């Protein structure tokens, strides 16, 4: 019954925003609100003031916790999986964002993850898997370099350098997939399963690119404009903004139905120089 209800009406879209350091409830609960009630006449606190125009459609759920997943800053995969998690520990099961993406009406990309970090970390590790998973031992990578993500989503409808880089990357990935698939057949049975996940990753990327090519005309209406934030970011927040633009465009265009945004990418990160926050940690 739940599945039937969720598949009717307009398109459903879900966004998970993960902040691994936690936050004070006072940053989202209006002053004087002690029990459940309408937000129509409430004044939202400064940190969520941007949601003021939408507060009559807004629900704030207070009191949820994940202390069973980790006693520290981040539970990594456990935060969305509901199980114990910690740094360097692979997922022991699927996460709720992935499971919900399967229940919603099918899209070209079932689930998109983007991660925001310091500019240095995003450049040296443009993809990382710490928060989402499709199953035990099956992490889902999040994208942190907006240039790479733009090529993945909109490279097929681009021109100039972006198009050339997209075509070159596509050719390389196709060749790697073919080579990897052929080499894996000679591995022992136990290793073949693990190696198969590696090959499947290339198949998923190449398959997504082919599916996106079939709706190129539609995607042109939603592709963000590439500007200096992509190629010459002054602060990490320039890339954060570009990643958010890409994530929202993927939702509105119908590329995906579920977006997971990892602030800090599941790790300990707190410097936002573009917002005037220079220090990191317990300051």
Labelled PLM ranges:
Residues 1-283:
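Ligand-binding pockets and gating/stacking loops
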């Amino acid at each position: 019954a739940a599945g039937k209800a969720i598949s009717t009406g307009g398109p459903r879209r879900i966004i998970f925003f993960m902040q691994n350091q936690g936050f004070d409830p006072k940053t989202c609960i209006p002053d004087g609100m002690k029990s459940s009630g309408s937000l129509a006449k409430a004044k939202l606190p400064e940190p969520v003031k941007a949601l003021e125009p939408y507060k009559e459609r807004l629900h704030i759920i207070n009191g949820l916790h994940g202390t069973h997943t980790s006693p520290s800053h981040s539970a990594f995969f456990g935060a969305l999986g509901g199980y114990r998690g910690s740094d360097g520990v692979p997922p022991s099961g699927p996460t709720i964002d992935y499971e919900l993406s399967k229940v919603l009406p099918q899209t070209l990309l079932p689930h998109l993850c983007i991660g925001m970090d310091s500019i240095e970390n995003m450049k040296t590790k443009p993809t990382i898997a710490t928060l989402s998973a499709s199953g035990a031992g099956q992490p889902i990578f999040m994208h942190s370099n907006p240039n790479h993500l733009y090529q993945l989503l909109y490279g097929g409808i681009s021109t100039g350098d972006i198009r050339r880089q997209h075509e070159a990357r596509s050719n390389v990935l196709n060749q790697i997939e073919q080579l990897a698939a052929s080499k894996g057949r000679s591995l022992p049975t136990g290793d073949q399963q693990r190696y198969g996940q590696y090959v499947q990753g290339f198949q998923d990327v190449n398959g997504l690119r082919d599916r996106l090519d079939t709706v190129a005309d539609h995607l042109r209406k939603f592709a963000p404009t590439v500007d200096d934030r992509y190629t010459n970011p002054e602060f990490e927040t320039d890339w954060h903004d570009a990643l958010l633009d890409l994530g929202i465009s993927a939702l509105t265009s119908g590329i995906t139905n579920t977006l997971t945004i990892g602030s800090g990418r599941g790790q300990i990160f707190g410097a936002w120089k573009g917002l005037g926050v220079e220090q990191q940690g317990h300051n």
